[in-house]
């Protein structure tokens, strides 16, 4: 909702600026063209929000809680050991049926960019989604967790094995390397938020075995907002801080960076009062903001898993406690 209001505000401001320049005879043709282009971009364009985090911070679960609670079960793979292995976009294009499109990892052998691959739909594997069948939906979307085993020379060719780099992926017992089966996934489905032009990017955990940070990080600059997830019980770990500093901090527009402290339920404790628990959560929030160098209003606290359970069971009190009732 905020997003559509925000878009209308930008539209109104651009309109006012055009008018102001026109009245004062300051509207050069190239300026007018640029402003009109911005207007069109604002009206038609998608807003890309990327979820980024260290492995197992709950990115996919948060997406489940926000987008899939109505299906009465977990849809995106988010259980231990089954996790998003390739960047996965959630969007809605009214011209296409509900489907999952997958780009095979082997396309990395060619020099074409992801943008170019988007233009060759026949190179993608397309799976129809039955939005009325949550089991079929979950089984189909489980494909984003698929991996394949390849030889070391193949892994080298695909960019998953670099000689002389210390933290290479561990070969399996048979000397093979496990890599993501897919390079990129796109889910097209109808949802009120997606209908407004929101596009969600779920990314592989950044220290998942074989997950190439560049698979994820090349997409970050295109995002209008990035939500960085942390676990509340650990706060900002050394590896969280490395990811933040390396990929997310110091962007020319820090206003696009948000932090979600997930798993606040790990601090819920039968022996503490709810005031004590909220106090603990608040301290973690303030401390996380300080360590990451962001203002406190950029850090929100949630429990994706409890929020998902609360929505499925229609438990208003649990939903309030999960902070996902907003």
What do the predicted segments below correspond to?
Residues 1-26:
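Charged, amphipathic alpha-helical linker segments immediately N-terminal to NTP-binding catalytic cores
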Residues 11-12, 36-326:
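Globular "head" domains of long coiled-coil molecular machines
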Residues 17-18, 29-31, 195-196:
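A short alpha-helix capping/helix-coil boundary motif
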Residues 23-30, 35-37:
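Solvent-exposed loop/turn elements at secondary-structure boundaries
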